[in-house]
């Protein structure tokens, strides 16, 4: 019996920042039902697919998503109801054709993605299989290394720190559950260290602490203290990573670090980052330069690419065409994967496959405005992405993804392995 789509319903819900977003539910002809929530970013790349907002200042301060909801109801539901559920990519193509634009500016990436993810989940419900097994049926699966954002700055926090994310990377363990435990213990130890220094322990959008610090380097220093006090070995069990989000402090050809009252040329900022990497066990730098500073990116890649993971987020925006441009120019060596940057599940998977073919690491990522949806955890397990960014060890919208990965590891048993240091393609010595 062919299982078909019988109902698609969209609802305006709130994300973790209290802003509206879409939740889409799909019902199939066999009675199976699933739903998905759509995340939203704060620090966004200029070439991301369009997140359609209403712009009505009298409602949710202009951030409502009734237009996107209407597009689900009036465009996608009529086009998809009655179609077989089996070929998810074909269903995505129907929606993409209806939109007809490169950046989903007609019907909205949030509308398309909500339906795309809900369709995939509904297929899993019908087959009585977890989403990761629907996306990639195989005998063994790899659990990703988490990149845990424990100090927030930049656009993710109201503090004096320029760099947006300071992360711990527990790559020196045998199981995901062990890595998660280490991250949790370091997070709570960091809170104690900050309190002892009279610093703020309020958290930012992604659950990390947001203290006022005298410099960006001071964030690494206090994290190193927390790692040691928690009983772990930095550079062996726990590594560091950062998301500079450099596009946010790039003006008139210079990188302006307000907390340090300094401005750098591209070459000088590459030297600044290289110096940090010499003094701290930093294994990954995301968006180290402005998204349009391709010459600077080439310099950064030449300087650090052999020993540090250089991740393009705003640079590549999960877009396979832009990633291919970067591959051709020898820029970066990894890509951040955010499904809502491109706007459909099938295009997300296509970009991950391209990265893998080019030997670029792929890191699945949340957004700063999240929901309880855990789809990205399943995508990380199903694909060749060996790392995941889903925030700190705080806030249920972040922890939900970690708990989903714990559940997957438990149900797979001996069929699961942890990516560990191998996730970084030789950047960490085993």
From Swiss-Prot:
Its EC number is 4.2.1.11. It catalyses: (2R)-2-phosphoglycerate = phosphoenolpyruvate + H2O. It is an enzyme of class 4 (lyase). GO terms for biological process: glycolytic process. GO terms for molecular function: magnesium ion binding; phosphopyruvate hydratase activity. Its main location: cytoplasm. Disulfide bonds: none annotated. The keyword Ribosomal protein does not apply. The active site is at 206 (proton donor), 338 (proton acceptor). Its cofactor is Mg(2+). GO terms for cellular component: cell surface; extracellular region; phosphopyruvate hydratase complex. Mg(2+) binds at residues 243, 286, 313. Binds a second Mg(2+) ion via substrate during catalysis. Pfam families: Enolase_C, Enolase_N. SUPFAM superfamilies: Enolase C-terminal domain-like, Enolase N-terminal domain-like. (2R)-2-phosphoglycerate binds at residues 164, 338, 367-368, 389. Keywords: Cytoplasm, Glycolysis, Lyase, Magnesium, Metal-binding, Secreted. The keyword Magnesium applies. PROSITE patterns: ENOLASE (PS00164). It comes from the Bacteria. It is found in: Cytoplasm; Secreted; Cell surface. Belongs to the enolase family. NCBIfam families: eno. Component of the RNA degradosome, a multiprotein complex involved in RNA processing and mRNA degradation. Catalyzes the reversible conversion of 2-phosphoglycerate (2-PG) into phosphoenolpyruvate (PEP). It is essential for the degradation of carbohydrates via glycolysis. This is Enolase. The gene is eno.
